[in-house]
Design a protein with these regions (language model features):
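Bacterial N-terminal signal peptides
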Residues: 12-26
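Vicinal oxygen chelate
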Residues: 31-38, 41-52, 77-78, 95-181, 202-212, 216-221, ...
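Mature N-terminal segment immediately following signal peptide/propeptide cleavage
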Residues: 37-73, 77-78
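Conserved active-site tyrosine of GNAT-family acetyltransferases
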Residues: 56-61, 119, 159, 189, ...
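Solenoidal tandem-repeat scaffolds enriched in leucines and small polar residues
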Residues: 189-190, 197-206
């Protein structure tokens, strides 16, 4: 540009506004925990144990459509979906999710047929038929029934089980939907999560459930007490909290003994705490993931 060229102030302002609006509209510029302002406690993350990080990145990114983000000064890589983050730790899992207290995690998707076709093309096993009752007709890995949901189940690396539920009305192509426990004490679990994390008690698919702003906590049946999550492929589940320190103090007053008490980690821009619920679910509480 010629140094003597004058810039029209009005055009300069329009250009500036264009850049700002483009940034705000960019998916990479938006926080992934969209529901962070809708409640004191929301769902935050799944934490995966695996010896094959690349296999899980392929599953969560290519298979399910997540995106990569970075956390804190260490720029730790995180896989992001609307209303849930996925953390990967290099460690040998003791088992998959089936047979543990948390049987699977669930997402809603606007196009289950495209998702299942993509997952099958990538070589992942669709286990829908074995997971659904005979009232569902299953074709090409997708289950349907009259007046019911269109759903599918996929088995990912290290035998992590994921459910997909079609919902064409959601705001994103895919987003967090539910955590599905398997327990002989579903009603007790519902009451416990209502008291300690503020989940609103109700039912989902006829099973005891609790609702938080961005996740349903579904407490499905099991005839026996199942394995704890810590050390398995889904090592723990995570809830994002406003004023975590205060909540930890409240939980301690209610008798919760923390596996790892409240601590702040400036390099990650986080505060965290860990406890295990009475049925063996390893739970992390965080404050700061809503900035990703």
């Amino acid at each position: 540009m010629n140094p003597s060229t004058k810039i029209n102030p009005f055009l300069a302002l329009l250009f500036h506004l264009f850049l700002v609006s483009s940034f705000l509209a960019s998916p990479s510029a938006l926080a992934q925990l969209y529901s962070a302002d809708k409640g004191r406690v929301i769902y935050g993350h799944h934490h995966i144990n695996t010896q094959n990080l690349d296999a899980h990145k392929r599953f969560w990114l290519e298979g399910l459509g997540g995106e990569t983000r970075e956390l804190g000064e260490t720029r730790r890589e995180v896989i992001a979906f609307p209303d849930v983050l996925v953390f990967l730790t290099e460690a040998s899992p003791t088992s998959g999710t089936r047979g543990t207290i948390v049987n699977h995690v669930g997402f809603e998707t606007t196009d289950i047929y495209a998702d299942v076709a993509r997952l099958q093309a990538l070589g992942y096993a669709m286990i829908t038929r074995e997971e659904l009752p005979e009232t569902y007709e299953v074709i090409d890995g997708i289950g349907q029934r009259v007046a019911g949901n269109t759903i599918a189940y996929v088995l990912g690396p290290d035998d992590i089980k994921v459910e997909l539920i079609e919902n064409k009305e959601i705001a994103h192509n895919i987003q967090m939907h539910h955590i599905h426990w398997a327990s002989e004490a579903g009603e007790d679990m519902r009451a416990w999560y209502a008291e300690h994390l503020g989940a609103i008690s109700g039912l989902r698919i006829g099973q005891p459930a609790g609702q938080l702003p961005n996740v349903n906590l579904t407490f499905g049946p099991s005839e026996t007490r199942l394995a704890r999550t810590q050390g398995t492929v889904l090592d723990h589940i995570g809830f994002e909290v406003k004023d975590l320190k205060a909540l930890c103090e409240e939980l301690e007053a209610k008798g919760i003994v923390f596996d790892r008490p409240y601590v702040e980690i400036p390099a990650l821009g986080l505060a965290i705490a860990f406890f295990t619920d009475p049925w063996g679910t390893y739970v992390e509480l965080t404050e700061g993931l809503d900035s990703i």
